[in-house]
Amino acid sequence: MFRSLLRNSVVGLFGLVARSGFHRLPAVDRAFIALYGIYKEYLEAGPIDRLREFVPSGSLAIDVGANVGFFSVRFARWVETSGEVISIEPEKKNFESLISALKREDLLGRVRALKAVAAAASGTAFLEINALHPADHKLSRDGTGIAVDAVTLDSLVPQKGSRRPSLIKIDVQGAEMMVLQGASEILKLSGPALFVELHEEGLARFGTSVSAILSHLSNYGYEAHWLMRRGPHLKASAAEIHARVARDGYVDILFVKAAD
């Protein structure tokens, strides 16, 4: 409950700044990005540095819904010079901030940054912009909004003769199932770890649900886990996941393939 209240407070603060027009000032914009990063690291994303065990040196990590680069910067550090990160972010201002963050950390050479959305099929999609919340831009369901390129993860990572992904992070405001549908070959043949945000209301906008995501990934042999600060990542039951979503509004879940 506290986490949800704080998240809403941060979003409300940005809304006030956006309505005032002060967000257009570079210093204010940088300050908000810094505040957002602190919020993500300490209150929302949980013990994300534990994801490093799924992103070894020389590996390929994919950040779907990269926003301003909170995860992409970390992934790029972890893969080191012999690895690669694919960062996908469709919104212009966020994409520019993503590139700036990577340049600032001298990591841009390790990242293939795409101004696009990941979807079930390649082509063109439409993005609804939320001017009051830079992390709440959504795919349109009715063809309105800003036209953006759409790509499938399978098209970005051919399964023959290329590096296979070790981790895919997905946070796309309810369109997670569409991303997964466009990654069927990756899920089947590579079986990377997945770190996915589950938000019942957001998923419902696209005609799906938390239960549907769990079932879909179970069909590929994935099991849900809590990302733990220490020790093994504990298995998360469907009932526990639904309870956490009901309490907090959303939850981040680590999915790994079951051991044979």
Where would I find each of the regions flagged by the language model?
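Phosphate/nucleotide-binding beta-alpha loop and adjacent structural elements of enzyme active sites
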Residues: 1-260
